[in-house]
């Protein structure tokens, strides 16, 4: 990515990691209700040997309103602690390391990065982040998906209770359940999100359409969010279904995908598309805008400290 405006030196690795973690956590806190709505829409219609029922949730705003009315406003933020834990370890790596890995893969010092090196950087940083952050993803999805309606006893009472119960009843491997679809999803997301943002921002600045500032960051992030949602939705739905499933409901990730296809049709793979885009689009805008600003401010702070000493 291009260096922050007004900066003579590119952001250091520690600045990029800290800025990525902070920006991702802020974006998560603001958009989390949309993510919860997306999860509920994705698991709707998931049969467990029961006759089909009329949909409870209709559309993203309807889902948010239904959850707030029937389960309380706090339900919209169920799983947020795990979500923030996830971003600290996950986003800081996949976003914070992207520039460094891309530069390492580029042919020479100061040479323009090729599309291949950008994609490879997205694959490597996204894949590494998934293995580290998967337990937090499992807990987040489980807490978002569970309902307290109709006298159902919740599977988990809180974030750390969920970690303990999953590890106890399903083994440590239960905390890495769904790693394969999540790896596929996040490789797609990381490549599309970061590479699209990188290329869009570079094109806008180099062609003098926009300066490297807020409007450029906003537009680049919005385009990246839409492209990412289109490509990642099918894998995201399968990942959510598989991670949330009870033991032995699906024998494997392909079995989960085939069950969805045969019972619900191909459109099931795009369930929750609108909330996914609203969430990813808004998440991208908030995260990238904050990421750029945090990098700039952290570099300024570092230079101020250096001058003072």
Swiss-Prot record:
Taxonomic superkingdom: Eukaryota
SUPFAM superfamilies, per the entry: Mitochondrial carrier
Keywords from the UniProt entry: Ion channel, Ion transport, Membrane, Mitochondrion, Mitochondrion inner membrane, Oxidation, Repeat, Transmembrane, Transmembrane helix, Transport
Residues annotated with Cysteine sulfenic acid (-SOH) modification: 256
Membrane-side (Mitochondrial intermembrane) residue stretches: 1-10, 99-118, 198-214, 292-309
GO CC aspect terms: mitochondrial inner membrane
PTM (free text): May undergo sulfenylation upon cold exposure. May increase the sensitivity of UCP1 thermogenic function to the activation by noradrenaline probably through structural effects. May undergo ubiquitin-mediated proteasomal degradation.
Major localization class: mitochondrion
Compartmental location: Mitochondrion inner membrane
GO terms assigned for molecular function: cardiolipin binding; long-chain fatty acid binding; oxidative phosphorylation uncoupler activity; purine ribonucleotide binding
UniProt-annotated binding residues for fatty acid 16:0: 58, 271
Ways its activity is controlled: Has no constitutive proton transporter activity and has to be activated by long-chain fatty acids/LCFAs. Inhibited by purine nucleotides. Both purine nucleotides and LCFAs bind the cytosolic side of the transporter and directly compete to activate or inhibit it. Activated by noradrenaline and reactive oxygen species. Despite lacking canonical translational encoding for selenocysteine, a small pool of the protein has been observed to selectively incorporate selenocysteine at 'Cys-256'.
Family: Belongs to the mitochondrial carrier (TC 2.A.29) family.
Name the UniProt record assigns to this protein: Mitochondrial brown fat uncoupling protein 1
Species whose genome carries this gene: Canis lupus familiaris
Gene that encodes it: UCP1
